[in-house]
Amino acid sequence: MEIKLVKGSYEYKNQIIDMLKEWIDYNENHPEANTSPNAIFRNNYEDFAYYLEHLEYKEPQEGLVPDSTFFCFDGKRNLMVGAMNIRHDLNDYLLKYGGHIGDGIRPSERRKGYATEMIRLALEECRELGLTRVLMTCDKNNIGSAKSIIRNGGILENEVLEEGSIKQRYWIVL
């Protein structure tokens, strides 16, 4: 598997939009699913210049932290297979429920090992940000996500209840 994390750009416009359309269709037909990083849906991709410009929070805003958004690109297949958002800091909400990294694999590419590798690459980015520990969370019923986190060194700290859903909180030492 040869994947890399890339920033959103016009070079990958078609692959990004193709992935977003698949995710939107999936989420409309599976309303119970929360399977994508919210950052990639902050803005409508139809105005792609605006979409790219507002993909990340570069300056702190009330209730939000600076972040970096990456897309996971499989160059052999010329396919965007996932996306992730790395929060540079944790506010109270992220410390309890969201963590440093929000990630997701496009529906047609799940259960192929991409998430484990994508998290490994994200942890390299976290090191570059100067983080020494990273918090990742997932719904307790998302076994695949938990396995990907554990494979990258995640140690379960505890479980917390968020709006009727049990979240597992894992710490990874870098």
Question: Which residues make up each language-model segment?
Answer:
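Conserved beta-strand-loop-alpha-helix junction that forms the acyl-donor binding cleft
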Residues: 136-144
